[in-house]
Regions:
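Short, hydrophobic secondary-structure boundary micro-motifs
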Residues: 53, 122-123
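Conserved small/polar residues in nucleotide/adenosyl-binding loops
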Residues: 112-119
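N-terminal subdomain of lithium-sensitive/metallo-dependent phosphomonoesterases centered on the IMPase/IPPase/PAP
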Residues: 1-82
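Hydrophobic alpha-helical segments, chiefly the membrane-spanning helices
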Residues: 124-129
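DPxDG-like acidic metal-binding loop motif
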Residues: 77-87, 91-110
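Short, flexible micro-motifs
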Residues: 59-61, 91, 119
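Short, exposed beta-strand "edge-strand" segments with a Pro/Gly-rich flavor and a Y/T-containing core
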Residues: 77, 120-121
Length: 129
């Protein structure tokens, strides 16, 4: 990975953490998470990458932003992204410690993603005897 891109990823996670930190101890998990998501998405969209979120905030119909399959960036190398803008929403809302922003980036098609339950055809599974 390009050294400059690695430094930019530090900035992305830092921006998300700082946005969430404004909600420490305020009791509102959704506001803390939304602040982190908004900040991380804004930063990701400023990078010169063609990114695809492969591990994110959930399926498209469950998460308005940073959902699995969402495209981010301004164009550049194709990359897969795994992220959690705020790991520890309850901790943050209650004023606790050790919440974090998480992001990983790899070349296109190199991050493993497990299939969602919707992708599994259970009728093809052998029945247990």
């Amino acid at each position: 990975m390009d050294r400059n891109l690695a430094i930019e990823l530090v900035r992305v996670s830092e921006f998300a953490a700082l946005a969430a930190s404004k909600h420490i101890g305020r009791g509102n998990e959704k506001a803390a998470d939304q602040a982190a998501v908004d900040a991380m998405r804004k930063c990701l969209n400023s990078l010169t990458i063609s990114g695809t979120v492969v591990i994110g905030e959930g399926e498209r119909d469950e998460a308005p932003m940073l959902y699995i399959g969402e495209k981010v960036g301004q164009g550049g190398p194709n990359v897969d992204i795994a992220l959690d803008p705020l790991e520890g929403t309850t901790i943050t809302a209650k004023g606790g410690e050790n919440a974090m922003a998480v992001i990983a980036l790899a070349q296109d098609c190199l991050l493993y993603t497990s299939p969602s339950p919707r992708d599994l055809d259970l009728s093809r599974m052998p029945s247990s005897a």
